[in-house]
UniProtKB/Swiss-Prot annotation:
GO terms for biological process: iron-sulfur cluster assembly. A motif (Cx2C motif 1) lies at residues 221-224. InterPro entries: Anamorsin, CIAPIN1, SAM-dependent_MTases_sf. Monomer. It comes from the Eukaryota. It comes from Glycine max (Soybean). This is Anamorsin homolog.
Length: 260
């Protein structure tokens, strides 16, 4: 039923003039050329005899004091097309004293049923629209995946030479400071020696040997480095441990120390 108008009432009779008055109230004068379907005693029907989503406008003209039942409003939502309009108004023969007393209840019923944009009319009526979405419908939210910003590398750009940051002072080879115990070409212990050189020199002096004899020991007979068992009585290395010729004689820390 394309471009159809459905008029319902809870009374036994519904004058067609009231239907057209309601159509004009909707601001659709062209609807007068249509043949509205009129249903009486609609409050007694469990289901409206109309296909789903087949009606553009539903006009409900009410006589009784009670508001339209929830089941009837749900049926009107079913038969209306998307963006279809429902108009509920008081009948001219209605026993309702003041429509304002039930208008708030009607508005709540329409919203709870799923209608949108309820609007109270001056002529003791209220209208609303069927939404374009289905009640209880759902859809998946698309998660926006944000990629990390890409770094643009310009291979044509000039590379910086790190050596250009070096000064002439940086390029000079560092010179190590002389040790505390080094004076000229010959190393001697300083006055306040803390490196152990003074103790070594003291041991050499007690033995009566020169520094050259300790650092580079030599032997005319070839037995000086073998130990006291092979040394002669006049050997300058008598009392020292065995050593290799040409290598510095290593003196132990307790050398020349008293046994008791």
């Amino acid at each position: 039923m394309d471009g159809a108008v459905l008029a319902c009432t809870d009374g036994a009779v519904l004058p067609v003039s009231q239907v057209f008055d309601a159509i004009r109230e909707l601001g659709n004068g062209g609807l007068e050329q249509w043949d509205p379907l009129v249903l009486t005693s609609a409050s007694l029907l469990s289901k409206l005899p109309v296909d789903s989503s087949s009606v553009d406008f539903v006009i409900l003209i009410w006589l009784s004091i009670d508001c339209p039942v929830d089941q009837l409003i749900q049926e009107i939502l079913r038969v209306l097309k998307v963006d279809g309009t429902i108009l509920i108004r008081k009948s001219s023969q209605s026993a309702v004293g003041s429509f304002d007393k039930i208008i708030s209840s009607l508005e709540n019923k329409l919203l709870l049923a799923g209608f949108t944009e309820p609007q109270v009319l001056q002529s003791a009526g209220i209208k609303a629209k069927k939404p374009s979405w289905k009640i209880g419908s759902s859809f998946a939210l698309k998660k926006v995946i944000r990629s990390s910003p890409k770094m643009q590398i310009d291979f044509d750009s000039d590379l910086i030479d790190e050596d250009s940051f070096l000064t002439e002072e940086d390029l000079k080879k560092p010179q190590l400071p002389p040790g505390d115990c080094e004076i000229g070409s010959t190393r001697k212990a300083c006055k306040n020696c803390t490196c152990g050189r003074a103790e070594e020199e003291e041991k050499v002096l007690k033995l009566g040997l020169t520094t050259e004899q300790i650092d580079n020991p030599q032997s005319a007979c070839g037995n000086c480095g073998l130990g006291d068992a092979f040394r002669c009585s006049t050997c300058p290395y008598k009392g020292l441990p065995a050593f290799k010729l040409g290598e510095k004689v290593a003196l132990s820390g307790n050398f020349l120390a008293a046994d008791i």
